[in-house]
A protein has these predicted regions:
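N-terminal Rossmann-like dinucleotide-binding module
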Residues: 1-7
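Contiguous beta-strand/loop segments that form the cofactor/metal-binding neighborhood of enzyme cores
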Residues: 157-263, 298-310, 329-331
Length: 337
């Protein structure tokens, strides 16, 4: 109640089901910890509410060594299917908040794909930074995985989306992932890292990975390579390169060179925000003039609301959400084996 008062939030509930009983609410957003995603989504769908779902759609939430990765795959896909079935059963729309899909640089890539008519042969994508500060992210029990799931869901979702888009544009059928190979590691737990002060990287990981790499093979034989790590200094990296049969497109969501600034002392910039997760404001920086817009946050909200209003599916919805979970947990199987 104190939080609600501070931010002028008119209604407070201690049970989400009470909120879902309200007849004046048509659409709910679920910005909650990953372990609550699928249960809240099913409850919302059963209440007839349309849903905006944070990434990833769901996962398997257990101690990292309690189950085999195959068992985790089965649990995660079961949870995902429960959400899909609830949405279909209740005829509600789920907007999957994969902002890479809506980022203006990726939207431009789609238009360039349309113009060129080329085939996507090789996709290379990354999201990396110096580590999450959210305590729940450090345990498999609450997060469902480490960097491969928590951050990898962004670039993996993006490359899946682009191949879906290509297939639908050319043949009317999305091109799906056929297989995946992957590796993961806990690089901040290495002996050399343990001995090294100061720690510029987050090191409080318990049983989740802080480094991951995956190679996806699609049904048409084309490839995507995805990196997701918590061992990358210098701010958030949201990058994608598309190698087409007749062109190359480099997408820089973060960092990008729309604004470049230099200061010998970080204090010169005072409290002015530069960009997310930089360890210092000194030296050359890449201040984003409108970080939310460049990452696609307003655009995804607009599409989700319009989809509900118009009774259509959003650009990023259940098919992408479901396949992303399937691919990531298949990647965990590969990494274990």
């Amino acid at each position: 109640e104190a939080f609600a008062t501070k931010f002028a939030i008119p209604h407070v509930y201690t049970d989400h089901r009470r909120l879902l009983e309200r007849q004046d609410i048509r659409l709910v957003t679920l910005p909650v910890v990953t372990s609550l995603h699928h249960t809240l989504a099913v409850d919302a769908a059963d209440a007839g509410k349309h849903i905006i779902m944070e990434k990833p759609l769901t996962g398997c939430f257990a101690e990292a060594n309690a189950l085999s990765r195959q068992a985790m795959f089965e649990e995660a896909t079961k949870n995902a299917d429960a959400v899909v079935e609830a949405c279909l059963r209740n005829r509600v729309i789920l907007g999957y908040a994969e902002n890479f899909v809506y980022a203006p640089p990726v939207a431009k890539l789609r238009r360039l794909m349309d113009a060129s008519g080329g085939t996507l042969l090789d996709l290379r994508a990354e999201e990396s930074h110096s580590g999450s500060h959210a305590a729940y992210s450090r345990r498999w029990l609450t997060a469902g995985g480490g960097s491969l799931l928590r951050m990898g869901s962004h670039p993996i979702g993006a490359v899946i989306h682009l191949k879906h888009y290509e297939g639908q544009r050319k043949t009317g059928t999305p091109i799906r992932v056929k297989s995946v190979i992957a590796d993961v590691a806990q690089l901040t737990k290495t002996e050399a890292m343990r001995k090294e002060p100061p720690k510029w990287l987050v090191t409080a990981w318990e049983d989740v990975e802080d480094w991951s790499a995956a190679i996806l093979t699609f049904e048409d034989g084309t490839k995507a390579t995805v990196l997701s790590t918590d061992v990358s200094l210098g701010g958030v990296k949201n990058l994608l390169t598309a190698y087409l049969s007749n062109s190359v497109v480099q997408v820089n969501i973060n960092p990008n060179s729309t604004v470049q600034a230099y200061a010998p002392d970080g204090e010169i910039w005072g409290d002015e925000y530069l960009t997310e997760k930089v360890e210092t404001k000194a030296g050359w920086q890449f201040p984003n003039p409108d970080e939310d817009w460049m990452r696609g946050y307003p655009q995804e909200m607009e599409d989700f609301v319009d989809a509900v209003r118009e009774g259509r599916q959003p650009l990023s919805g259940l098919p992408l959400a479901r396949e992303t979970v399937e691919v990531i947990y298949a990647a965990y199987i590969s990494a274990q084996e």
